Amino acid sequence: MADQARSEQHVREFARACVRAGLLDDAALHDEVRQAVTADLPDRADVAGELAAAWIDEAREELRVDQESWPEATDYERLQSAFAEVELADVEVLQGCDDHWAAKALLDERAGAGTTPRGVAWFTPADVWHAVDEGMLEVNLWHGTTANAAPGDALLEDVLGVLEKHGLTARFDEGRIEVDAHWHKRIAP
């Protein structure tokens, strides 16, 4: 019974993280949570769709209540402004992409079109989930050649400067940019 309760809590937390990340449309969100119910709670697979809908609604209501206490400008909004500015400097930003292969595919596509970007910044849904609860978003940064950014690179310094300009503290550590930011993405009231 304790394992069942832990599994249910795990799926509920997954639903909460997905809702707060805001990376999926309604249908994809429901499908992800339904699949998690089916996989983690197989004895409740026959009601997986209903449980997914209920737990998503519960997570959305919790988010609506929480966002009332957020400041006027959240870290998420500052991140979006910073990412828009970074993109103006020919650095693509992939938010919530599947993995490094998505960044590689983007760079290959742009290179094939003769428009290799200066770089690409990317992070996965798991990185967003970490920022939802822990207040740190880890961002990968590659040059347009797929080479990792490194200390002393103008690309890295420029991206760090843009983040700082938008009120975000960031540092390069172990191959990634660590941004002190809570992913507080608002949903409609």
Sequence positions of predicted segments:
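Long, contiguous N-terminal structural blocks used for assembly/anchoring
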Residues: 1-97
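Short, charged low-complexity intrinsically disordered segments located at boundaries
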Residues: 44-46, 114-115, 189
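A broad, low-specificity signal for short, low-complexity segments enriched in glycine/proline
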Residues: 54-56, 101, 188
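Glycine-rich, often proline-containing surface loops adjacent to acidic residues and nearby aromatics
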Residues: 58-64, 132-143
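Short linear motifs at secondary-structure transitions and domain/linker junctions
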Residues: 67-70, 112-118, 154-157
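An N-terminal amphipathic alpha-helical segment
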Residues: 95-138
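Acidic, proline/glycine-rich low-complexity IDRs
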Residues: 138-189
